[in-house]
Amino acid sequence: MCSAVNRDGTAIVTGANVGLGYACAERIKELRPDWTLVLACRSREKAEAAAARLKSGGAGSNIVVMDLDLASLDSVRRFAKEVAVAGLPPVRALVCNAGIQIISETSYVGGGIETTFAINHLGHFLLANLLLRDLAPAARIVFVASGTHDPKKKTGIP
């Protein structure tokens, strides 16, 4: 990594309460213990539990839980505004990890957008665009993807 990344900073991980997002959060705290880690999750209760697990594993105290529901573009906008005014160190990493797969009936969020598309794609697209002004030089944005929308897999997505 370049030396610019070694200064204090903030990493934001969406869906950091379980799975790949949690593993990513663990690794970030291991490699950059001086950074502030933002767990951006839909469920505050689950995010607080994840933060407690990270802290009990020696991750340090600079872990922040923030509410983010990617199914709601209003929630994404609120989150971006909160990041801008929170007084966090410069954002050096944004990991867009949160995602869902609904195999049952097709569902829609506000505005008539299919739920998995809203959460897995549009929410993260808006989030990344809104946070561009808050990113430090040499910051990284990582998008985690899946085969959820692969039409050959017939997973229930229209």
Language model features by range: what are they?
Residues 2-158:
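Rossmann-fold NAD(P)H-dependent dehydrogenase/reductase core
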